Amino acid sequence: MALAAELIRAPSVTPHADDALELVAKRLEAAGYRVERLTFETGGVPIPNLYARIGTDGPNLCFAGHVDVVPEGDATQWHHAPFAGTVEDGVLHGRGAVDMKGAVAAFLAAALAFGRPQRGSLSFLITGDEEGPALDGTVKVVEWLKARGETIDHCVLGEPTNPDALGDAFKVGRRGSLSGILTVKGVQGHVAYPHLADNPIPRLLKLIGDLTAAPLDHGSDFFPPSNLEVVSVDVGNPVFNLIPAQATARFNVRFNDLFSLESLKSEIIRRLDGAGLTYDLAFQTGASQSFLTAPGPFTDLVASAVEEVTGRRPEPSTSGGTSDARFIKDICPVVEFGLVGRTMHKVDEATPVKDIEALTAIYGRIIARYFSTFA
């Protein structure tokens, strides 16, 4: 808990996470870890990351996380200063307590208590670019690991996975995400002379209707149904007497393992083409594929460790938004387990100290069981 409070007292609003990351690096170096400080600058701002490892042989169990946080908002609305790391009545208060400095501190404490594995390796992948664009964070560290032939066999990501109580759920996969911009062009004109104009809005509404009329699917064994949401419809017209020249809709799809990115794009185009209308469609960069860490010894190990400490067997889940697991899954199986997420990103973010202590115990059991199972 003391380390979690210290991390909170190192303000690290994305992308300025250097001080918080250095706290982690120094503790790992003191414990004998080989620490690589990695800075990437694709987006124009230097982003700090670290990869640290103790041991040289496999298997390599990695903890992944981030120390950057979202802004605190209006600090006067907080009952405790957002970067003071205050503990009151058994609760740790501050930005990042839940998401996710508490989990970083818990795994660090568990790993240092475990020491150097007799066989195999322990490692950390910690970024300062998860809450921001995520261009120079975990995705770049994964590329760096691939380039140098560094192998990670399994990974635990410390995102807050529990909706209400520690032990509710752990993430075994994530839905994919695809965004698009749909545009219909017309001819601008005066509303009193519609025959001299061409209103694109009715055609856009027809396309939206065809796009959303039927479910994309009905879900799979591990995922809920894929979901397409239209998030904006824009014509850029603030007046009442002008027919607009074009109309645009933006949409996002969260999709399951029944689709690949390409098959989903094909289905969207098929539905739009069925309307028999002319349109422009631009899929946005940054799309991600769904993934699943299949049930097996690793997921059982994590679930059992949670159950031993909390008394409840966590439900495997694929709900929620995206996380850095979408990058890590390219190099190894990954599961996510952390604190209770009710206050993440909110004013008065906080977590009970007992939850951090229990999470430390869970991570300790995961580490011990991992090397007795896989090493």
UniProtKB/Swiss-Prot annotation:
Catalyzes the hydrolysis of N-succinyl-L,L-diaminopimelic acid (SDAP), forming succinate and LL-2,6-diaminopimelate (DAP), an intermediate involved in the bacterial biosynthesis of lysine and meso-diaminopimelic acid, an essential component of bacterial cell walls. Homodimer. It catalyses: N-succinyl-(2S,6S)-2,6-diaminopimelate + H2O = (2S,6S)-2,6-diaminopimelate + succinate. Pathway: Amino-acid biosynthesis; L-lysine biosynthesis via DAP pathway; LL-2,6-diaminopimelate from (S)-tetrahydrodipicolinate (succinylase route): step 3/3. Zn(2+) 2 binds at D99, E131, H345. PANTHER family: ACETYLORNITHINE DEACETYLASE, N-ACETYL-L-CITRULLINE DEACETYLASE. It comes from Xanthobacter autotrophicus (strain ATCC BAA-1158 / Py2). The active site is at D68, E130 (proton acceptor). GO terms for biological process: diaminopimelate biosynthetic process; L-arginine biosynthetic process; lysine biosynthetic process via diaminopimelate. Its EC number is 3.5.1.18. InterPro entries: ArgE/DapE_CS, Bact_exopeptidase_dim_dom, DapE_proteobac, Peptidase_M20, Peptidase_M20_dimer, Peptidase_M20A. The keyword Metal-binding applies. Its cofactor is Zn(2+); Co(2+). The keyword Transmembrane does not apply. Zn(2+) 1 binds at H66, D99, E159. Belongs to the peptidase M20A family. DapE subfamily. Binds 2 Zn(2+) or Co(2+) ions per subunit. Keywords: Amino-acid biosynthesis, Cobalt, Diaminopimelate biosynthesis, Hydrolase, Lysine biosynthesis, Metal-binding, Zinc. The gene is dapE. It is an enzyme of class 3 (hydrolase). This is Succinyl-diaminopimelate desuccinylase. HAMAP family: DapE (MF_01690). It holds the Pfam family M20_dimer. One of its GO terms (molecular function) is zinc ion binding. Disulfide bonds: none annotated.
